[in-house]
Amino acid sequence: ADKEFQHPYFFQNTYSDQNLYLGHGTLRHVESTALCDYELNRKYCRGIDIDIFVLDGFIENPVLRFFHRTATMIVKKSLRGYVADLNDKMKFDKRLIAWASKGLYRFVSYKKAFAFYEQLFRMVDADKSERVSVLAYRYSSHRRIRKRSSYNEQVWIPFENVVYPAPSDTHDALVCYFGDDYMTPLHLPTAHGRRYLDATRPYQEVVEELKQHPEQFAERIKLLYTD
């Protein structure tokens, strides 16, 4: 996918960017900005993005699923620990994992470790699984787990002057992800917290400005997220 997009679009994943772990793909617009306050010193692209998720096969046997989930979580935590900034505030156990992971990946490429992480999910054939989910992104045994047959047919749904493809049982999908009351409007930050958004300037320019004037981040957030 990284060869399909040209500037200003950039397909971002663990392989394509620096010091980054992602359990999914992201399509970024590099001439824009979407960043959280903890991302000011990160090296990876922080343009406005669209997330792209792969559906993984769900293991129905609870014993096999336990061992599979445990194995993937060990690798995932080590990868997250490696890319973590030790200057950030974090709990003692996460800091310990980060120290250990940074030592480990001096000898082993963390991108090779991520390839192994992906292979753990490929071991479960999604085409033959009764249910699927975005397990590489968030491994849950009770949420976001849906029947594979739900994706056999699509319907097109209008939303804000754009038409989107969706599973035929869209209502069930929305309940699965957001709960029974998903239609009630809520004034909340994004799933990533309060982000600094600028559709007109590249993130490199915004980052340098915010490093010089960090108070502008709070001012921008107040403007974006306050009624």
Model-derived segments and spans:
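Conserved catalytic core of two-metal-ion nucleotidyltransferases
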Residues: 2-60, 68, 77-178, 184-227
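Short acidic alpha-helical/loop segments enriched in Asp/Glu that coordinate divalent cations
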Residues: 64
